[in-house]
Amino acid sequence: MSLIKNKNCFIPKKIFSEKDDFIFIPCDGVIQEKFEKIALSFESPKLNEINFHKKVKIIYFLDDYQHEIKKEMLPSSIISIIFYNIKNILSSDSIPDTVKFLGFNGYKHQITNEIVKGSVTSLGVGGDMGYPLDKHLLNGSSIKTLCFDGNYSHQITNDSIIDHLDYLCLMKTKFPLNEKSLKNPLNIYPPTIPKNISFYETYKFPIPGTIFPKIESTIITFNINITDIRQPITSKLFQDLPINYNVYIGWGYRHKLDECTIDSKIRFLGIGDVVHPVPETFLGIRVKFYSGYSHQIKPFPNNASLRELALGNVKYPITKDTIPSPWGVGELSIDKGYDFKLTPDLFENVRALKLIDIKSTVFTKHSLPKSNCVLAKVSLISLQIPFDLSFFPTDIINTMLIHNVSQVIGTNQLPKSLTSLSLIKVKLDPKLTIPKSVSHLKIEEIDRPLTKESIPNNLEVFELLNYKFPISKELFPDTVHYIVIGETINPFTIEMIPTSLKHLVSAHDYKFLPFDKPLLKYYYQ
């Protein structure tokens, strides 16, 4: 198992080489306060003889540590414990409830939910384990991150991969993933596959697309993260990869990508910190350059169907020539880290724009063209800069999403041409009047109640989610025919129904189910 290194350490030379950089407790059991990570071996004293300070967060039990391990002997500050080739049999009395990460390398006994308690959210296994990891012995656990490392000695099977993980990390293993490792044998829905599957630099096997199971739903997606792995990826990954998987390549990936091609399927490809530039033939139809891409982004071929282009922390700006002609790009996303000024010529063929946590020097009132463009949709996410109508072409934008911005949203922030508006986690001007043209309105976690005057008279679809104020009939004009109701402080009743209502849908957090009987004829599950 890969162990954490630290510059501030002192080394037991009989056990470790100088490069190991472990923090080791000597026989006197004294820990200087600057150390948060400590290591215990057969030379170390018993736990109850060590004077732990409150800054100790990580403990390594190393190489034949023989003393008793009891949770009451450990400080309450501990959040991570790694067991490295210990012979002790651990029990429910061994692990404190404060521990979030447990690592086992060369552990010869079964790992069960008796040891891995509910507080543990991350688990690492590696080395010559006595038994393969068995998820059935971990029922009821809260594991969201699982790592295989340290030349893990068993085949990684479906029984080894805990269901519904957020992250599966594959490092140094004795055997590769195969077509049965991730496959859900019972076809359970939603699928039990990890949301993120990461292959790290010590992973030494090819990564074919066939090891990733096909999912019938096209709504659910998963991420494959590829770092500087030993073997280059090939076209075999993409040719056989189901469309549900997004692929991110970066983190120092050193192999050339020339021989790899993306097929025409609807696939998202992320390109980050790679050693070699990406050729045009490698790019798909949904591409993101992120996390230190240090090469010039080459122009996409003309007539290319580019549905989405996202830019993050890249070294060079895009230009007008980057975007293919004549079809342009479906959505251009400018993410946090992009540090170049946006100019109107970039947006001549951009149909949707998403801005995420960018600087005021990047996006100004002069960035977007005010006419002669096709920009119909704008999403503003986590912006900490002021904006108003002068920033946008006000006669063509029909869809706008505003999420978690610092700007107070009033009438002067909303184009009159809008037909669809989403306001999520925003502050509203008390005098806000939503444009009359809006027919689809989504509201979630706003800071003040809506009024009858603020709601457009032609509203047809109304999503009212996580609304912290009383709801009443005046919120639902008689033009509304579709309502989605989420968390509210009082129930939606028959008195609130607009005369035009056809469908009533409850979000997952609506707590006043079942609806009253008169409402059931509208209820759509």
From Swiss-Prot:
Q: Which domain of life is it from?
A: Eukaryota
FNIP repeats mapped onto the chain: 65-107
Keywords annotated in UniProt: Repeat
What name does this protein carry?
FNIP repeat-containing protein DDB_G0274617
Q: Which organism is it from?
A: Dictyostelium discoideum (Social amoeba)
